[in-house]
């Protein structure tokens, strides 16, 4: 939890450095719903980081894992002209057009969690997260060290390219 809060605070700090106004509006568009056990920690980190830094933030996510809906949420965020947008990037091909529209509008974009392999190709300013393939390799090594001989990687979000890469590791 502390690590997630630190990552979110770092993301927000970086976004703030690129704008001059005191009242900063940051929109977070995630593929993970705030009621999911993992993503609730991330949302709480966003909320705490924004409160601590005295900025306004909005966390949005599709009701289910849905790249078309997520692209619409990014487009909607762009139309609100925030000072910065933080996104997850589970599928660069599906979200690329929307991300590039944000950047073309002069809005700083940072990715978190997923997207380490693709964020630079889209022009995203920075990424906070692990490289997916290497994370999968590390997970496999830990399982082997614990005595595991076989593994099954289940991708619970069909279409999440980042998880496909992790399973490949």
What are the residue ranges of the model-derived segments?
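Sec-dependent N-terminal signal peptides
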Residues: 6-12
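A residue-level marker of the well-folded mature domains of exported/periplasmic proteins
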Residues: 2-5, 16, 21-169
